[in-house]
C-alpha cells in the first residue's frame, strides 16, 4: 500500500472521549422544537447531529423561516455542540499506544490530517493533551469543510489541504460514517475496533474489509502491506 498521507477520525479512533452526545442532541432538539420544529420527529439516539440538522434545514425551508432566524438557530446549535465537546476535554485520554503509533507514522514522512465533525478548538485541545498535536499537518473540524463526513466533499477538501490526491491517502476511523465518507470519495479505508459501540458502529454490524484492533497496530500493518 503506497501512501503519502493518512486522514484520521478523532473520537474513538485516536482518543477516548466521553462527550455526552445524547445530551447534546437533546439540547439541540429542544431548541429546534421550541422554535417551531414538529415535536417528536427528531431523535437523540437514532439520528446523528448531521441528520438532525438536515431535517431542521428542510423544515425551515418548508416553513419559509427567514434566513436571519435560521442563522440565529444555527449559531445557538453550534454553541451547544462546542460546549459539550470542550467539557469532555478534561477527562479525555489517548487510546493506548496511539501516540507512539502516530509518531512512527510521521517519522516515515507521511502527511497526517484530522477530519472530525467536532469543533476545531476541541480537536486541537484533545491532540495537545495527548501529545499528538505537533504531528498533524492539517486539522479540520466542524464547518471547515464544504460538507461534513460522510459527504465526499469532506475528504476531497482535506486531501487538497494536504497537497495530495485521494489516491495518495487512506482514511482511518472507527465508525460507519468514516467508512461511508471514504467510499463516497473512492478513498481507501482502514477501520479500527475502538468504537464504543463495537460491531454496532458498522452498518448491519458488518465491519470494513480491513479492521485493526487499534491505530496502535497501524504502523506494522502498513509495513507489512507496503509495496
Locations of regions flagged by a protein language model:
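Asp-based, Mg2+/Mn2+-dependent phosphohydrolase catalytic module
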Residues: 1-6, 103-106, 120, 124-227
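N-terminal helical cap/lid subdomain that shapes the substrate entry/recognition surface
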Residues: 1-96, 103-104, 108
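Polytopic alpha-helical membrane proteins, predominantly small-molecule transporters/carriers
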Residues: 89-90, 114-116, 171, 175
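Residue-level recognition of oxygen-bearing side chains
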Residues: 19-20, 97, 177, 217
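Conserved phosphate-coupling serine/threonine residues in phosphotransfer and NTP-handling enzymes
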Residues: 13, 116-118
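Residue-level marker of regulatory loop/turn positions in helix-turn-helix DNA-binding domains and
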Residues: 94, 115, 147
Amino acid at each position: 500500500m503506497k501512501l503519502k498521507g493518512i486522514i484520521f477520525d478523532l473520537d474513538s479512533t485516536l482518543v477516548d472521549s466521553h462527550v455526552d452526545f445524547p445530551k447534546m442532541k437533546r439540547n439541540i432538539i429542544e431548541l429546534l422544537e421550541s422554535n417551531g420544529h414538529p415535536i417528536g420527529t427528531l431523535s437523540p439516539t437514532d439520528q446523528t447531529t448531521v441528520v438532525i440538522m438536515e431535517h431542521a434545514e428542510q423544515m425551515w425551508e418548508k416553513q419559509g423561516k427567514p434566513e436571519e432566524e435560521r442563522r440565529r438557530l444555527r449559531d445557538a446549535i453550534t454553541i451547544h455542540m462546542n460546549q459539550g465537546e470542550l467539557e469532555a476535554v478534561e477527562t479525555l485520554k489517548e487510546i493506548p499506544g496511539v501516540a507512539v503509533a502516530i509518531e512512527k507514522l510521521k517519522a516515515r514522512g507521511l502527511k497526517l490530517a484530522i477530519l472530525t465533525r467536532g469543533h476545531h478548538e476541541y480537536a486541537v485541545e484533545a491532540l495537545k493533551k495527548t501529545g499528538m498535536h505537533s504531528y498533524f499537518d492539517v486539522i479540520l473540524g466542524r464547518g471547515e469543510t464544504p460538507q461534513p463526513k460522510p459527504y465526499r466533499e469532506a475528504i476531497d477538501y482535506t486531501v487538497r489541504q494536504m497537497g495530495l490526491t485521494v489516491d495518495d491517502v487512506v482514511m482511518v476511523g472507527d465508525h460507519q460514517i468514516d467508512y461511508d465518507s471514504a467510499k463516497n470519495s473512492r478513498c481507501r479505508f482502514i477501520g479500527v475496533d475502538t468504537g464504543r459501540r463495537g460491531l454496532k458502529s458498522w452498518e448491519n454490524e458488518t465491519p470494513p474489509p480491513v479492521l485493526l484492533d487499534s491505530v496502535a497496530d497501524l504502523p506494522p500493518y502498513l509495513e507489512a502491506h507496503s509495496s
